[in-house]
C-alpha cells in the first residue's frame, strides 16, 4: 500500500504458499492458545482466489472469515465453505440506504447471507452501531426481519462504533466528513430482535 503521493510503501506481498507457510509455522502456538487464523480487511473476498488457495495450504488451523458478504456468489461460496467460522457484517437493511452510505446496494450481500445458511459453516451476524445511521429503529427492525426470515437461526451481535477513522484521516492530512455525528452515542433497541425471537446481544 502506498501513501496518497506515492512517497511511502507499507506492507509486503506474499504468494499463497508464502503466507500459508508463515501461518503454519505458528500453528502449534496458535493451537495451544486455542486460537487460529482470521482473514479480515478491508474486505478479504476482494482476493477470493488467493484466499482459497491459502486456506487449502493451512495445516489443522481454525479459520475464520470476517466479511461484509459483498462478493460474487461463487467467490463467497468458495471461501466460506473452506472456513470453520464466519463473521458476517450486515450494516443496513434498506437497499437505497445501503447504497447511500456504502456506495453499493445490498443485493449480493443478502444473497450470500442466505447462501451461507445452506453451507453448514457456523456464523454470526454483526451489525456496527453507527450513530444515526445503523442504530435507528427502522434499520434494526429491518435487519431483525431479514434475520428472522433466514432458513436457520442465527445470532446477531451489535458492535460499538469504531471512532478510529477520525484519527486515521488526520494522519493522512485528509478532512474527515462522515455525514453523521460520529461523537454521538448509539442507542440500539434490542426489542426489535426479541419481538421476532431473534437472539441479539450488545458487544
Where are these regions (language model features)?
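Conserved Radical SAM active-site core
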Residues: 1-82
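Hydrophobic faces of well-ordered beta-strands that scaffold small-molecule active sites
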Residues: 37-39, 63-65, 86-88, 123-125, ...
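Conserved radical SAM core fold
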Residues: 44-46, 69-76, 86-102, 129-130, ...
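Surface-exposed amphipathic alpha-helices with a cationic face
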Residues: 51-60, 117, 148, 194
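Charged helix-capping and loop-helix junction motifs
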Residues: 52, 103-108, 138-143
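Conserved strand-turn element in the central/C-terminal portion of the radical SAM core barrel
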Residues: 97, 113-143
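Auxiliary Fe-S-binding modules of radical SAM enzymes
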Residues: 131-203
Amino acid at each position: 500500500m502506498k501513501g496518497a503521493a506515492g512517497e511511502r510503501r507499507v506492507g509486503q506481498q506474499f504468494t499463497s504458499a508464502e503466507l500459508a507457510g508463515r501461518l503454519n509455522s505458528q500453528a502449534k502456538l496458535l493451537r495451544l492458545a486455542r486460537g487460529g487464523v482470521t482473514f479480515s480487511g478491508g474486505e478479504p473476498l476482494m482476493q477470493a482466489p488467493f484466499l482459497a488457495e491459502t486456506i487449502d495450504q493451512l495445516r489443522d488451523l481454525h479459520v475464520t472469515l470476517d466479511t461484509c458478504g459483498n462478493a460474487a456468489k461463487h467467490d463467497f461460496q468458495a471461501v466460506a465453505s473452506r472456513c470453520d467460522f464466519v463473521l458476517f457484517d450486515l450494516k443496513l437493511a434498506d437497499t437505497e440506504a445501503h447504497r447511500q452510505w456504502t456506495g453499493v446496494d445490498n443485493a449480493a450481500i443478502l444473497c450470500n447471507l442466505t447462501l451461507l445458511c445452506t453451507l453448514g459453516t457456523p456464523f454470526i451476524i454483526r451489525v456496527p452501531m453507527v450513530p444515526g445511521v445503523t442504530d435507528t429503529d427502522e434499520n434494526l427492525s429491518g435487519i431483525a426481519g431479514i434475520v428472522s426470515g433466514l432458513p436457520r437461526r442465527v445470532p446477531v451481535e451489535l458492535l460499538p462504533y469504531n471512532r478510529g477513522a477520525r484519527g486515521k484521516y488526520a494522519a493522512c492530512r485528509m478532512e474527515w466528513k462522515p455525514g453523521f455525528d460520529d461523537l454521538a452515542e448509539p442507542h440500539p433497541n434490542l426489542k426489535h430482535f426479541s419481538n421476532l425471537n431473534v437472539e441479539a446481544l450488545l458487544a
